[in-house]
């Protein structure tokens, strides 16, 4: 199923809306429902969607209950599959191609007034170098018609780029906007090893949609989901430029940094394309980042004790804090679970371990468990000298 197939419940907004703060202001004023803006002043002929990927909407879109999603993602991690390759003539993303690349002509939004400018926050980057492929999320500041500046946190893509630059090489990439939600989930997962996230997406496609994941090859050799709404391709150059400020997942403003410049050589899109214009710091952002962390935390904790469930908390912005439910069998299971959970998601700042009778999605029940069962001097550990998340508002 394509991205657009999951927008049936969206409210269509026909009134003229500016991509400069307009979509953000309208969504905020209406409590962030699922919206499709079809009359964007600066980019006629292009639509934009926001607020699709809340936990409940995402699970409904891919046909599983919220209680099943952790085990479904964990299954895909253990059972990767291979996508199939289709010719560009069969790929919906190739229905239209710009004569010359003009990213300013598509609805990349400037949501928050504090942001540096227009940002693509929901697009995934697929990169290939030295036989390794990586798919991951990285926000991109729209610098001009054919350049963006990409924020690369210290994970696999930055390592790939650093290796390439040491050899004097650029990195071939594609930027994919609005593939189906299964691809987005796989792209949001992170692993210690260089696992091909598209193989995880392919496994999820087969399990949830009963069909293979279709990819098509671009001019630079990078393979991308064939049904995506937008695809643009080029290379991570040897140059850096200013990136930020940017309102991040915590609602705090991230710093200005020197980050890599991407230069684009081609842009294609579907007929009547719909840009995924995620609003940073809101529920969709937190869901997309937080949901894929839960199975990695559960997997890590399950190696030291019996882990039942994991919940990334709303107060922790879906990223910095979690509640983990275990079935305690040994006196030190709780402490071991804390250490394992923090190792399973290294950006996490706080984790709370509770017994199997607690509803971990209910903050009142979690607080009750703490005040009735937690002894701070015995049941608390603090890990010193660890690296903070770059999204930690304190740093």
Give short role names for the model-derived ranges.
Residues 1-55, 367:
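An N-terminal JmjN-like helical accessory module and its immediate linker preceding a catalytic domain
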Residues 6-28, 73-261, 267, 295-300:
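Conserved mixed alpha/beta core segments that line enzyme active sites in large multi-domain catalysts
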Residues 241, 245-333:
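C-terminal substrate-recognition/cap domain of FAD-linked oxidoreductases
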Residues 54, 139-143, 190-193, 247-252, ...:
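Short, solvent-exposed amphipathic alpha-helical segments in soluble enzyme
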Residues 46-84:
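Low-complexity, highly charged intrinsically disordered N-terminal segments
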Residues 314-381:
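Substrate-recognition/cap regions that form aromatic- and gly/pro-loop-enriched pockets
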Residues 385-392:
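Conserved small/polar residues in nucleotide/adenosyl-binding loops
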Residues 2, 19-21, 43-45, 142-145, ...:
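Flexible loop/turn segments at secondary-structure boundaries
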